[in-house]
Amino acid sequence: NPTVNSVQRDYMAGEISKDLTQRVLLRQEIVDAHNEGLIHFHDSDCFAQHMHNCDLVNLEDMLQNGTVISETMIEKPHSFFTACNVTTQIVAQVASNQYGGQSVNIKHLGKYLRKSKEKFAKQLEDEFGDTLDQAAKDKIVQMRLHDELKSGVQTIQYQINTLMTTNGQSPFVTLFLHIDENDEYVEETVQIIMEILRQRIEGTKNEKGVYVTPAFPKLVYVLDENNCLKGGKYDYVTKLAAQCSAKRMYPDYISAKKMRENYEGNVFSCMGCRSFLSPWKDENGEYKWEGRFNQGVVSINLPQIGILAKGNEEKFWKLLDERLELCYEALMCRHKALEGVVSDVSPIHWQYGAIARLKKGETIDKYLHNGYSTMSLGYIGLYEMTYLMKGCSQTVEPGKEFALRVMDYMKDRCAKWKEETGIAFSLYGTPAETLCYRFARIDREKYGDISNVTDKGYYTNSYHVDVREKIDAFTKFKIESCLLYTSDAA
């Protein structure tokens, strides 16, 4: 809401940061490429600050070992409600010191739900001893636990939507809902997930007292063998999730089976809305996901290459090479801007557990190399590019084959950069809510109305089939599924 003071101030700060970025911090070649729509240097309004993009918050470490928020020590919680309250405070602090989204795994709250249950049981034992039979005690414990469960989840839902970050927004946070039967607290996790879904179905009241769908937290629910509606133990949870999606559009869904195929047997959350990490192992050979992050994104304008190539493949590949090199240089600017940054720029991230536990004054450099964090190459307009080069979309040949070749080529280029630098470059289905229009507007101004390309006022995001294509949903999914696996970053 641009009439609100905090939002106005953030807009003004962002414009100053953009100006500094273009006049002082970036090479003129990259600035020109951005302004002319060859590439897009994402989030330049935050580039003057030493910020990274998105991450998976190491909530387990922060709750178990404590953290510090605004120079105040927060010790290990002893109840579910307190753990929920601390979680929302962590989320707000993290969001204020990065520009991308964050995700937390809700299973880390399971331990604290059990602590509350044990606390209630002890209270009853101390208060009533043998004067109450065990069945009565169990019933009272469950009643008290249900009240605390409801209050804790309500705290998360309402505080995330009412706490403001420094830019006047609600924190962009995703709750990862995974029923992992290898987890000691799986039954507690199931109870928490059920309550999250029930409260999301109900919604939150707006200023007029009407129940509406809250924007955050985003919910991501994992479908696995134990809950995929094929007789699994937790199918009932998935049925509630489906009811929730039908009414509130969330949760989104992740296939554990497909994730294990794609990520060396692992299942983990995206960082915020869509960005996924690459596999990385620590010194003990253990996979690590939480406490990792994305350094930043640069996107390439594919339709503009198609416009200039005019169906000539030799010219197309030459232009693609040149512009991918521009993207690489722009991404390395992001990387180098983070090198040498000290942990003091964001204590919640670098000193108190969200990502690391570095000392004051220590640089974050070791987390920028060797694949620990990622760099993302985004792309816009595979549909329009294919139409310009082959006269058809990626839904039919020869468009489909050409689109796959381009995707594979960009992915291979990311792999080459990774091998040369040790930085985890990967291909990214771009967050292009406005970029789809920006690129199309620039190209329309430069090249005029081109039928089925610039004349419609937008470019199609990443690998997707254009929304105007006369195609049923399942055929669309099938075609896109051949392309999305190349987009391993998002």
Task: Please place each PLM-identified region on the residue numbering.
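Conserved phosphate/anionic-ligand binding catalytic regions in large, soluble enzymes, centered on
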Residues: 371-385
